[in-house]
Amino acid sequence: MTAAVEVEAPQIIDGLSAEAYHADRASISSSGLRALLNPGCPAQFKYDRDHPQPHKKEFDLGHAAHLLVLGEGPELEVIDFPDWRKKDAQIQRDEAYLADKIPLLTKDHDMVQAMAEAIRRHPIAGPLFTPGQGLAEQSIYWTDPATGVRCRVRPDWLRGPIVVDYKTIKDAAPDTVSRAIKDRSYHQQDAFYIDGVEAAGLAPDGARFVFVFQSKIAPYLITVRELTDQDRDIGRARNDRALRIYAECESTGIWPDWTGPVTEIPQIGMPSWDTLRQAEEYLT
């Protein structure tokens, strides 16, 4: 007989800081689940969790755009210099970081303002992000009933039953977005966020997840899409596998790499399509 899993009640927290949310080790997020599966592995996930990375300046533009679109996030500090080469510019930048602000050069501030304006003008994204008609960055916690793992999500914007996820990207062309969904396993995020919102009782008739991708290159074009049902099902199946892996690792204290425990050296080859192509060319 399978042992009963203790299920803690769902919880919705308003006003929780991003730092506190990401530092929580009693639950797992969508990015954590994705990191457990190939090309990641449990060993790398655990190391990264135990050794948080310092702030990455390359994320500042994305965070600033999120603030202007969602109305939530650290305050912006405009640094009136053309670049960061001057010592005074670097000093002002570092002081802004110490004050928990996002430092932006004037040109970058103008850029994110233009990006936010493009969102507001967009016929689909604009209405989705209408101020006062949604909630930004609520923290939602629930327990996976199959494994007992405590889970968490933090939707960018929740408008009724619609989860709106805003992402900046170098190129928002649909083909590029499609590859990004595959490369970053955003189909797992889609399924996980829908499950979290529904588990918390925020969408009694079912939740929807909408991606809003915006190019970081002028004129800051936007692609709004919903995931196919099949890809969402794949994402949910990947989440289920990752949850089982996580529960096992937490229970045993063993966090394996890609190979896992073996009694002999495994084989490896080229990607299958390369093997087929070269076999056809050289072995026939």
For each feature predicted by the language model, list its residue ranges.
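Generic detection of intrinsically disordered/low-complexity segments and helix-coil linkers/edges
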Residues: G15, P39, V78, I91, ...
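Metal-dependent nuclease catalytic regions and adjoining charged, substrate-binding loops involved
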Residues: A9, F192-T284
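Alpha-helix initiation/capping motif
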Residues: C41, K56, K86, A173-P174, ...
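Compositionally biased, intrinsically disordered low-complexity regions enriched in proline and serine
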Residues: H22-A23, K46-D48, L98, K167, ...
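Amphipathic alpha-helical interface surfaces
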Residues: D108, V112-M115, Q189, G235, ...
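Metal-dependent nuclease catalytic cores that hydrolyze phosphodiester bonds in DNA/RNA
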Residues: M1-R152, T259-G260
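Mg2+/Mn2+-dependent nuclease catalytic core
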Residues: P131-R236
